[in-house]
């Protein structure tokens, strides 16, 4: 059962009920709290574009608690974050793994955060193939190409040499919030909401 809380707000016209995500969107906060698939990506991309249209100068925050998911869906979010004019701040709550970690690092440099007990996990892309040998070969070449692309972007986003990223993403690599900061995946560990403004 997926229960979405409702928030009642007083306005000069009376009361207005919002689902919690719509209310947060009014404050330019987007929640990424699930595995990343095409539906989730379309929702996040739509929210980013909507907030840019509302105010292209004001920052947007994405709160991430995600095990990762589809590379192509994640890249749609990543490309939109880079494409829009507002700066996008990212905040890890709980876990940012795989594509979730990639999107966490994709936030505006200086505005990438994690809460103290959150974890970040990086690794190489996962995939599988079946069918004729030529189809398996095509799939293998594609996933190796995706791995190279993701590693190059992570190297640029973290400031780590490409060889370090390649080594560290060879297997699941879990980091505490503080370790993620030292590695360059985030810029600051937040203990209170006001820390982000400093």
Swiss-Prot record:
GO biological process, one term: protein quality control for misfolded or incompletely synthesized proteins
Locations listed in the record: Cytoplasm
SUPFAM superfamilies: ClpP/crotonase
The entry's keywords: Cytoplasm, Hydrolase, Protease, Serine protease
PROSITE patterns per the UniProt record, alphabetical: CLP_PROTEASE_HIS
UniProt cross-references to Pfam families, sorted A to Z: CLP_protease
A GO molecular function held by the record: ATP-dependent peptidase activity
The UniProt record lists the keyword Oxidoreductase: no
Substrates-to-products reaction catalysed: Hydrolysis of proteins to small peptides in the presence of ATP and magnesium. alpha-casein is the usual test substrate. In the absence of ATP, only oligopeptides shorter than five residues are hydrolyzed (such as succinyl-Leu-Tyr-|-NHMec, and Leu-Tyr-Leu-|-Tyr-Trp, in which cleavage of the -Tyr-|-Leu- and -Tyr-|-Trp bonds also occurs)
Membrane-crossing segments per the record: none
InterPro entries for the chain: ClpP (IPR001907), ClpP/crotonase-like_dom_sf (IPR029045), ClpP/TepA (IPR023562), ClpP_His_AS (IPR033135)
Cellular component, GO, one term: endopeptidase Clp complex
Class in the EC hierarchy, top level: hydrolase
Enzyme nomenclature, EC number: 3.4.21.92
Active site: 98, 123
Top-level taxon: Bacteria
Subunit structure comment from the entry: Fourteen ClpP subunits assemble into 2 heptameric rings which stack back to back to give a disk-like structure with a central cavity, resembling the structure of eukaryotic proteasomes.
Role, per record: Cleaves peptides in various proteins in a process that requires ATP hydrolysis. Has a chymotrypsin-like activity. Plays a major role in the degradation of misfolded proteins. ClpXP1 is involved in the complete degradation of the Site-2 clipped anti-sigma-W factor RsiW. This results in the release of SigW and the transcription activation of the genes under the control of the sigma-W factor.
Family: Belongs to the peptidase S14 family.
HAMAP family per UniProt: ClpP
NCBIfam families, sorted: clpP, PRK00277.1, PRK12553.1
Name the record gives this protein: ATP-dependent Clp protease proteolytic subunit 1
The species this protein was found in: Bacillus licheniformis (strain ATCC 14580 / DSM 13 / JCM 2505 / CCUG 7422 / NBRC 12200 / NCIMB 9375 / NCTC 10341 / NRRL NRS-1264 / Gibson 46)
Gene of this entry: clpP1
